[in-house]
């Protein structure tokens, strides 16, 4: 489905009911494209994807796994809410090589980059998770393939 998926990981498969469980727990609805990604690729390794938006370069090194990873969706949300730095309407989507996270907004699906050293100033990346995946799809770093 996505050419940026590099390698299938074992023991990370999830079911629709697990997605629904998390949606109910947080009172959110994942965008359809994100649900489809999780069902097919939860935890899979991806190519580094580098793209530029408004003269700022972004790199995507990993899509946050919904479950079963060291830095899974729920672990990140728990830490974010405990720390109180990330707005409650933002949920983790991906991260860059430096450990900074991309978040999607449940209110309008906009995607933002939040740098660890500047959490007060989210940087707008694109208007939807689908746009984010499109940016990744056409901007893979083929030098590391």
Go through each PLM region and give its residues.
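Short, well-ordered, mixed-charge alpha-helical segments that flank or form enzyme active sites
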Residues: 100-103, 122
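Short acidic-glycine loop/turn motifs at beta-strand connectors
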Residues: 105-108
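A surface-exposed partner-binding patch
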Residues: 1-100, 143-145
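Short, solvent-exposed aromatic-acidic interface loops
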Residues: 116-120
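Compact, glycine/acidic-enriched structural inserts
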Residues: 121-143
């Amino acid at each position: 489905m996505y050419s940026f998926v590099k390698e299938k990981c074992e023991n990370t498969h999830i079911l629709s009911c697990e997605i629904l469980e998390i949606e109910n727990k947080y009172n959110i609805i994942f965008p359809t494209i994100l649900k489809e990604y999780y069902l097919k690729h939860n935890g899979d390794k991806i190519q580094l994807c580098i793209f530029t938006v408004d003269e700022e370069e972004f790199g995507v090194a990993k899509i946050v796994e919904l479950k079963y990873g060291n830095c899974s969706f729920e672990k990140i949300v728990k830490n974010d809410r405990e720390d109180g730095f990330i707005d409650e309407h933002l949920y983790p989507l991906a991260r860059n090589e430096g450990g900074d996270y991309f978040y999607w907004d449940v209110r309008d699906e906009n995607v933002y980059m939040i740098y660890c050293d500047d959490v007060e100033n989210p940087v707008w990346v694109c208007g939807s998770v689908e746009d984010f995946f499109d940016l990744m799809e056409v901007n893979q770093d083929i030098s590391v393939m």
